[in-house]
Amino acid sequence: MQQQNIQPFLKNLVLIGGGHSHAIALKMFAMNPLPGIRITLITSNSYTPYSGMLPGHIAGFYTHERCHIDLRKLASFAQAQLYIDCVTGIDLKNNRVICANRPDVSFDLLSIDIGSTPAIISVPGATKYAIPAKPVGNLLHHWYELVEKISYNPQKPVKIGIVGGGAGGVELALSMLGNLQQYEPNLDIHLFGKDKRLMPNANPLLGNLLRRIFIKRGIIVHLGETVCQIAPEGDIENYIVICESGKTVECNYIFWVTQASAPKWLESTGITTDKRGFILVNDNLQSLSHPQVFAAGDIATVKNHPRAKAGVFAVRQGKPLFENLRRSLLGKTLKKYVPQKDYLSLIGTGDGSAIATRGSFTLPPSTLLWHWKDYIDRKFMDKFRDLPEMGNGALGIGHRAWEGKQTIQNLQMPCAGCGSKVGGNVLETVLRRIQLEQPVNQREDIIIGLNSPDDAAVMKVPTGKVMVQTIDYFTSLINDPYIFAQITVNHCLSDIFAMGAIPTSVLALATIPYGKSSTVEETLFQLLSGALKQLNQAQVSLIGGHTIQGDKLAFGLSCNGLADE
């Protein structure tokens, strides 16, 4: 058979999280394709916020679209699969990612960039009554509601509490005030910090400067105060912030922007972490305990070079992460990455000005610094705008020669003489996995089906009924075989319903992209799992089918239904 344009999948690279590092790495995979590698991005949202622009968005300077990266478009450009789901665990023994709403996802190499969340669990009432700064989507949802309420009735007294005196809390307070001032509201903003100055990890000059700005703008600062409880007080949206000192402050909305923490599910994976639960990595951004795992951004702590959890490091780690993922996939020596010790921070003050600080050096607010920050942020985001619908990506269409080409050439490809069929062992393994996780619905009128497979399926047609049949077949509509199969099932069954019949059984025809057995198995498993989810809901039996390999994922069903004579 002709093979020169075929790029079979040899390895599965799975990326968990759509953080800055992964966004940059995906863009670089699109621009520097690696044939034979299938990339899958698993993320809970299809848009990921850029932290550098988020305060400006809250202040009203940027639209939602301008400060978010479209991961669907980016994944399409990189020809990567995109799974929208929440990760709940990782099986590092069997190299599988456990998701909340879909089958496990197998990997050969894994990278994690899921950011962090504010540590609020230990404070009574915080989880129930406070609004955490992350996930950002939830924060923005509450913020939009608050802006709408204040704009509708600006004279109604509103008290906002912000817990956290670090950079995040400071920028949030200034940005909220900058936006809400346009309504001339009856507004108080309280900021609580456990240290004696704002942004305690920065130089004292910056903390003192910020304190003066807060006083000038009327933001009430409670420094040296550790919040120990959030309690409801009478009416809805009325709470008491209780501090260890005994101080109490009444607030209507409480935003939690404290020290970052890692998700709890990481604890059960067995991966080595630091004391706060973040993944410990070496200078190559590779897990200390599991070499098949890489991590970057807030979720990672570089053991030899620990740094603050700041977006600047996530951005800087994007390129070295890409380089080491690429080298690992090719079996090459990894390259060390040493993060910088000092970095320039440009802090927006919510009014079209910004502060610049690095080390012991600080410049007061100016519009020139804001324009500089705005230029830097827009330049970064422009890298992810106006992307073509599909690039060369990991599939390597029209790719340049690479070190793994010989491996692809040596892969045994199925021949046309055997119909390019998927191997029996692969099919048996997939069906066995599916029966364990999602048993096939077997109707009483099915005499021979998947429970007792033979050369053909056998069905009964009850007296007084007629058989209604239809067939449909589609190439992949989206880059997620699990969802694609569900869409296909619904479309195929709709023709039976349109004839006034009840669907009873289906035969499947699947074309799986070329690859080694493990990658073919993973695709087929995701595809059939999605199909069976919809078939079982419709009480329709999968009774057989045919599976071949080809250059593009495709799926179809021959559907059987019954109707009255």
Task: Label the predicted regions.
Residues 2-12, 79-161, 182, 244, ...:
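FAD-binding core/adjacent interface of flavoenzyme oxidoreductases
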Residues 2-81, 171-204, 395:
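Beta1-alpha1 glycine-rich phosphate/pyrophosphate-binding loop at the start
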Residues 9, 351-406:
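C-terminal auxiliary extensions adjacent to catalytic cores
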Residues 82-89, 180-283:
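A Rossmann-like FAD-binding core segment of flavoenzymes
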Residues 128-156, 248-315, 323:
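FAD-site-proximal beta/loop scaffold in flavoenzymes
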Residues 312-340:
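Internal hydrophobic alpha-helix adjacent to the cofactor/substrate pocket in enzyme cavities
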Residues 407-499, 543, 564:
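N-terminal glycine-rich phosphate/pyrophosphate-binding loops that anchor nucleotide-derived ligands
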Residues 466-469, 473-476, 483, 502-565:
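Glycine-rich anion-binding loops of enzyme active sites
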